[in-house]
């Protein structure tokens, strides 16, 4: 039959990863490796580029290459209920995880989540396993990705917990804060905020009606 314009809407759900599905990887890594300095996040150093270079310096100082880091990350589990939430969500929506982390760090956690689609960044790794640098896929990757998906005919639904999720949340047809901070919730009272996966599932389902 002929494709009537605007009759069917195709949705894609875009989710932040850290704080939503898995713990903050660097904080969990700092605890598991016993290197407390690595707990520093973008809240302490807003310049992500600077923060990452500083982190890589600390790893080098401690002689930690990618293999050692991945072995530590393998001990980190997704947040309780995250896998079930994703499995259920993917029964009725296409889902893309969008994160500022790196494919190589996220790999052990993606395995535990059933290998969802993840858009993130890449590390530069030397033959001996030393992490020598990193490549950010694109500036403002969350907002850029949502806009790109909209340009190919998708309506997006987005959820995340932090400041760098606000762009994609505000640009989407529906957007939700999940386990966010009191400050962000107070500053953006117009964005519905949820704490539990079943609430978020219901909100996403309702947004697709």
Residue ranges of each PLM-predicted region?
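Short, acidic/turn-prone active-site loops that include or flank metal/cofactor-
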Residues: 120-125, 180-184, 198-200
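Short, Lys/Arg-enriched N-terminal segments with co-localized hydrophobic residues
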Residues: 1-9
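Substrate-recognition "cap/lid" segment bordering the active-site pocket of phosphatases
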Residues: 104-156, 187
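Short amphipathic alpha-helix with an adjacent loop that forms part of the alpha/beta core around
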Residues: 203-209
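Acidic, Mg2+-coordinating phosphoryl-transfer loop and its flanking beta/alpha structural elements
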Residues: 95-100, 154-195
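Alpha-helical segments flanking ligand/cofactor-binding loops in enzyme cores
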Residues: 87, 147, 166-167
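Short, well-ordered alpha-helical microsegments
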Residues: 103-107, 165-166, 201
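Alpha-helical substrate-recognition element adjacent to the catalytic core
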Residues: 11-122, 126-127
């Amino acid at each position: 039959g002929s494709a009537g314009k605007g009759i069917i809407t195709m949705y894609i759900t875009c989710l932040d990863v850290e704080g939503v599905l898995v713990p903050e990887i660097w904080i969990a890594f700092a605890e598991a490796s016993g290197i407390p300095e690595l707990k520093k996040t973008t809240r302490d150093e807003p310049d992500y580029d600077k923060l990452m270079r500083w982190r890589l310096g600390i790893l080098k100082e401690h002689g930690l290459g990618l293999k050692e880091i991945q072995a530590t990350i393998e001990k980190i589990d997704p947040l309780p209920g995250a896998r079930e939430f994703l499995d259920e969500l993917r029964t009725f929506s296409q889902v893309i995880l969008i994160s500022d982390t790196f494919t190589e760090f996220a790999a052990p956690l993606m395995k535990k989540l059933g290998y969802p689609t993840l858009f993130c960044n890449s590390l530069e790794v030397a033959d001996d396993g030393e992490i020598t640098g990193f490549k950010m896929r694109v500036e403002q990757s969350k907002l850029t990705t949502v806009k790109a998906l909209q340009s190919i005919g998708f309506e997006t639904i987005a959820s995340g917990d932090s400041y760098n999720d606000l762009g994609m949340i505000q640009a989407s047809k529906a957007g939700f804060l999940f386990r966010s901070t009191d400050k962000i919730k107070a500053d953006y009272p117009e964005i519905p905020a949820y704490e539990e996966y079943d609430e978020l599932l219901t909100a996403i389902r309702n947004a697709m009606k």
